[in-house]
Structures are given as C-alpha cells and as structure tokens.
C-alpha cells in the first residue's frame, strides 16, 4: 500500500529540497498544503503529488485528510506579525492533534535551535525575552510534546541554514544575503571575534528528513529532539574560509569584543533588543547535534567552501 505524507511549507527553501528528495528516494504519495501553488518550482503534474490549496490558518478544512496520513512533515512558520502565535502555536497544535496515532508512523516538526541550550533543553530566556517568533516556537514545542502523537514525534532543530539558487529553489534567509556579505569581505577580513556555530545546507536537511521518515530514530526516550548541523566552526574559521575562497589575504585583525560593540552602540545611540543582547553575550551557539554522516549519509555541503562555490 502506498505511504502518504502530509507536508506544510513545501514551497519554501527547505520544503523544496524535502519534496524533491521524497519524490526521488521513495515511492510515497505527497500531499502538499500550499497557499500559492505557483511558488512550487517542482513539477507538480506528477501523479504522486496532490496539491491542497490552503495554509495553516485554515488547517481545520483538512482534518479528515490529515487523519489518514502515514507521515507528517511541518516546515511552515510565521516569522513575525500579529498572526505569529496563531500560526506557530495554535494551528500547529491543531495540525498534529489531527493525526491518528494508530495510522501515523512518524511526524516531523521543524523548530529552531535558538530555543535550546547546548544539551537540547529548552532555554527559559527564549520564552521570557525572545522575539515573537522565538517565543512561539518555544511554546509550540512544549504543547506538541504533550500530545498523544508525541510518541511518534521527531522535532528537528536546524542551525544556520543555507540553500536555494533563486531559480528552481528559493533562497534561504541566510543565502539570500550571501552575495551582499561577500561584497564586504575586503573589510571583514580585518576583524576577528570569539564565537562558534553550526551550519547546514537545505539539501542535507532533506537527506536527513527522508532518512528519519523512512527508518525512524530510536533514542529510547520519545519524543525525539535532533539538532541538525555540520561540526561546529568558529567565527574566525568562517572568516578565514570566506577570505580564502574570495582570495583576500588576512594580515592583521582587530578583536571585536562585547565591550567594543557596546561602545559603538553608545557612541551612535544604537538600540538593541533584549534577545539580541542575550545572543551577543552567548556567542557560542554549539549543540549536541547530528550530521548526515551520523545517519549513514554523506553530506553534500560539509564545508563553507562547498556552499560558497554554489553562490
């Protein structure tokens, strides 16, 4: 019997890669919830694609369909504005509650690593001082992990996401600004600072999601939380890789410290939100994470240079 998977956010950057991966690597039937099908660059004339015209705001209309699904992948989110809580918390809660626990094998929810500490525990600061988006993702996860479907739930927490090309796949938020950043490399090369992070390309996210859907992930203690990203790299490593790629030599560098940033803020009367100040103090966004290799896969974009070569 053909397996059925319900996908939200299929027209976004990560969504495009997931749809493409599932079409190429499984024989499943995909049900895509799309507000604007014209944004989907994948050939949706395939007999394995069913387009459902709508969005999370009217998810109740699709309750009977969702109850029949073997799998669910929810990548859709509201990034800010008056509907942030409605979409990211209430409607996602409704979506996952419509799944039949006797039918659904696995449900994947996309959150953000920004709400976690390095041990994958929820950070109270995300709820207390986070942006509307951050706070809503924090609240949603708490609710989803208390639903009956929690035993089948895998929450993935992408780190810094690259991907897209502006043609058959839309850019991620980070990749959309990459060309602009590269213009400033002649100046950035003179700077250094303490900090570290993970990154991952949307292609590799899609690899991981497909693997998780097909094979599952047993950590012995559901629901599962997985931070996905390549091994950590320092900010200074990133600067060095970008400079090497663009052939800008590094001679000497100015140390950018929190004290220096605060001085610049004071001199120019720059305002910074409480959440941004918290992130500035954190500096190291490093987690207990998994890579494609941890699941027996091979990352297509293991290094920053691989990503830059696609720009």
Regions found by a protein language model. Give the residues of each.
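N-terminal Rossmann NAD(P)H-binding glycine-rich loop of SDR-like oxidoreductase domains
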Residues: 3-28
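NAD(P)H-binding glycine-rich loop region in Rossmannoid oxidoreductase-like domains
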Residues: 45-94, 98, 116-121
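Conserved Rossmann-fold NAD(P)-dependent oxidoreductase catalytic core, especially the SDR/UDP-sugar
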Residues: 93-136, 154
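Conserved beta-loop-beta element that borders a ligand/cofactor-binding pocket
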Residues: 143-168
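Glycine/proline-rich active-site loop of Rossmann-fold NAD(P)-dependent oxidoreductases
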Residues: 163-178, 213-225
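A conserved pocket-lining segment of Rossmann-fold NAD(P)-dependent short-chain dehydrogenase/reductase
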Residues: 178-200
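Substrate-binding strand-loop-helix patch
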Residues: 194-203, 224-245, 258-262
């Amino acid at each position: 019997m053909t397996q059925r998977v319900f996908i939200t956010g299929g027209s976004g950057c990560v969504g495009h890669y997931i749809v493409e991966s599932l079409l190429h690597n499984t024989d499943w039937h995909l049900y895509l919830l799309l507000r604007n099908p014209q944004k989907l660059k994948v050939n949706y004339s395939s007999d394995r694609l069913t387009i459902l015209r709508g969005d999370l705001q009217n998810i109740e209309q699709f309750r009977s369909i969702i109850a029949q699904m073997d799998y669910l992948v929810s990548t859709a989110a509201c990034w800010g504005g008056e509907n942030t809580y409605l979409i990211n918390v209430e409607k996602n809660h409704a979506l996952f509650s419509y799944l039949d626990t006797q039918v659904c094998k696995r449900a994947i929810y996309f959150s953000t690593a920004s709400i976690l500490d390095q041990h994958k525990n929820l950070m109270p600061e995300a709820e207390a001082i986070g942006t509307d988006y951050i706070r809503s993702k924090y609240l949603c996860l708490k609710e989803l992990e208390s639903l009956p479907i929690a035993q089948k739930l895998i929450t993935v927490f992408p780190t810094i996401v690259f991907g897209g090309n502006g043609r058959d796949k839309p850019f991620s938020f980070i990749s959309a600004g990459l060309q602009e950043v590269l213009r400033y490399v002649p100046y950035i090369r003179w700077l250094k600072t303490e900090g570290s992070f993970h990154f991952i390309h949307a292609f590799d996210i899609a690899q991981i999601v497909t693997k998780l859907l097909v094979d599952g992930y047993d950590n012995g203690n559901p629901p599962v939380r997985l931070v996905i990203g390549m091994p950590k790299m320092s900010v200074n490593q990133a600067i060095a890789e970008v400079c090497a790629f663009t052939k800008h030599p590094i001679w000497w560098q100015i140390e950018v410290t929190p004290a220096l940033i605060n001085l610049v803020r004071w001199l120019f009367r720059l305002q910074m939100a409480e959440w941004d100040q918290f992130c500035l103090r954190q500096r190291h966004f490093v987690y207990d994470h998994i890579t494609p290799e941890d699941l027996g896969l091979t990352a297509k974009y293991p290094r920053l240079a691989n990503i830059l070569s696609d720009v």
